[in-house]
Regions:
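Active-site region of glycoside hydrolase catalytic domains
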Residues: 133, 163-338, 357, 365-388, ...
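Boundary/entry segment of secreted carbohydrate-active catalytic domains
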Residues: 62-118
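N-terminal carbohydrate-binding/catalytic regions of secreted carbohydrate-active enzymes
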Residues: 94-162
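Histidine/acidic-residue-rich catalytic or RNA/ligand-binding cores of hydrolases
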Residues: 337-346
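C-terminal GPI-anchoring signal of eukaryotic secretory precursors
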Residues: 55-59, 409-445
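Intrinsically disordered, low-complexity basic segments at termini and long loops, enriched
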Residues: 1-62
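Cleavable C-terminal sorting propeptides in eukaryotic secreted/cell-surface proteins
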Residues: 434-464
Length: 464
């Protein structure tokens, strides 16, 4: 197997120069490589102690089997993410409310190895933006709710923010969108609500004045609870108490060409009423579907029904039909408290895997079948410092050490499946294009597997 130079860089990041030297020797033909250096007494003693703690040879065998399982999980996750992100509609939320996350440079390497090409932050962390320079990954960065009133009151505040958080990083880092506030209209801070649109306008003007040479969209993320009604989707409508805020925001989106962002979690609906919400309907699993009497359309999953309810609400509020909807957050927790039914790794794998299959296939909603759904999955890592119920700390696809929380199957058993991103992204084009896709995917998977192998070795043997 050809080992890309990036693999050595990745290994060096995690384990140091000695590990790179050892790997270089291990992949040489035996006739070319030097003989294996003797293992010192201290390392031998340390290894014997580890074997004793694990129960001798049986324990070592258990470690090997555990390592094989983790590598299998890593392979499935890598294939899933590479396959989906190749369609340019898959993004991931990179939250950092944790004390055990890897350095941004390591995250950049990890996401590149998985083929993720869109990332959404909840701030404008300079370490992250610097680490992702020249990677080609598109970033959505954020203005915090605490800054809205200052920006609404003074255009200079918005200019200073752009000068500090955007200009130093472009064009090396691709910043494609700025979200101004998060779920502001769902709170009770009327001053922040009144400041939201003026702050959005100020940031948009500041970006234009900065002369960046590239378009940067301005939007704000809203919870789906800004809707007064969401089912049937055709009856979607915004809450009356928010109408005075929402209509001008929709006009802003129509004027600037930016999307309306919505955070939508079918898990919350299922958690609130497990007896009234079909779990297969929430998880994109086979189910009879639900017919919308207003349009005659049938919905086989809750997320797409929620998206179409937002479209209907926008139309009812006088919004233009050309304003798009982006799902800025969605996901499913792998763990929860006793009063959080459905929060399991199995359900999380089903939700995210089935969603990614549809995204990779370019599937639209029943109301807008020709418009692929733009999605940011929540989240990249489990975040151990998030407040609230256990589920809040367990939305991650990955543990902080980079190992998968669960096996994620965004593909399928073969090319016959209608929503099979592995075959869609790799084999649906011409033969020459497919060959390029296979080479690209193989390299990405190798890098991802290498990272996982490093993590496993560090856990098991402390060689690095």
């Amino acid at each position: 197997m050809h080992v890309n130079a990036s693999a050595f860089i990745l290994l060096k990041i995690c384990c140091g120069d000695g590990a790179v030297t050892g790997m270089e020797q291990s992949i040489k033909p035996r006739s070319e490589g030097a003989s294996r250096p003797p293992v010192g007494p201290e390392r031998q003693n340390r290894q014997r102690r580890k074997e004793k703690d694990m129960g001798g040879e049986a324990g070592m065998g258990l470690r090997v089997r555990a390592s094989s399982l983790l590598l299998s999980l890593a392979l499935q996750l890598a294939v899933a993410l590479v396959s989906v992100s190749a369609q340019h509609k898959f993004g991931i939320n990179y939250g950092q409310i944790a004390n055990d996350l890897p350095e941004p440079a390591q995250v950049a390497t990890l996401l590149q190895s998985m083929g993720v090409n869109k990332v959404k932050l909840y701030d404008a962390d300079p370490r992250v933006l610097t680490a992702f320079a020249s990677t080609g990954v598109g970033f959505t960065i954020a203005v915090g709710n605490e800054d809205l009133q200052a920006m609404a009151a003074s255009p200079d505040a918005a200019r200073r923010w752009v000068a500090a958080n955007v200009q130093p990083y472009v064009p090396a880092t691709r910043i494609t969108c700025v979200t101004v506030g998060n779920e502001v209209l769902s709170g009770n801070d009327t001053a922040a609500m009144a400041s939201l649109l003026p702050a959005m306008r100020a940031v948009h003007a500041a970006l234009g004045d900065a002369g960046l040479g590239q378009p940067v969209a301005v939007s704000s993320a809203h919870s789906v609870d800004v809707l007064a009604t969401s089912f049937p989707p055709s009856s979607g409508a915004f809450r009356e108490d928010l109408a005075g805020y929402v209509r001008p925001i929709l006009d802003f989106h129509a004027q600037t060409g930016s999307p309306f962002l919505v955070n939508a979690y079918p898990f919350f609906s299922y958690k609130a009423s497990p007896g009234g919400v079909s779990l297969p309907y929430a998880l994109f699993q086979p189910n009879p579907g639900v017919r919308d009497p207003g349009t005659g359309l049938t919905y086989d999953n809750m997320l797409y029904a929620q998206v179409d309810a937002v479209y209907a609400a926008m139309q009812a509020a006088g919004g233009r039909a050309d304003v798009g909807v982006t799902v800025s957050e969605t996901g499913w927790p792998s763990r929860g408290d006793d009063d959080e039914p459905g929060a399991t790794a199995q359900n999380a794998a089903a939700y995210n895997g089935n969603l990614m299959r549809r995204v990779a296939a370019g599937q639209g909603t029943p109301l807008r079948p020709a418009v692929p759904v733009d999605v940011y999955v929540f989240a990249l890592f489990n975040e151990d410092l998030k407040p609230g119920p256990t589920s809040e700390r367990n939305y991650g696809l990955l543990y902080p050490d980079g190992s998968p929380v669960y096996a994620l199957d965004a593909g399928g058993p073969g090319p016959g499946g209608s929503l099979n991103p592995y075959y869609t992204s790799m084999f649906s084009s011409s033969s020459s294009g497919s060959a390029v896709g296979v080479t690209f995917l193989t390299e990405k998977v190798v890098l991802s597997l290498l990272l996982q192998a490093i993590v496993i070795l560090r856990r098991s043997y402390s060689y690095c």
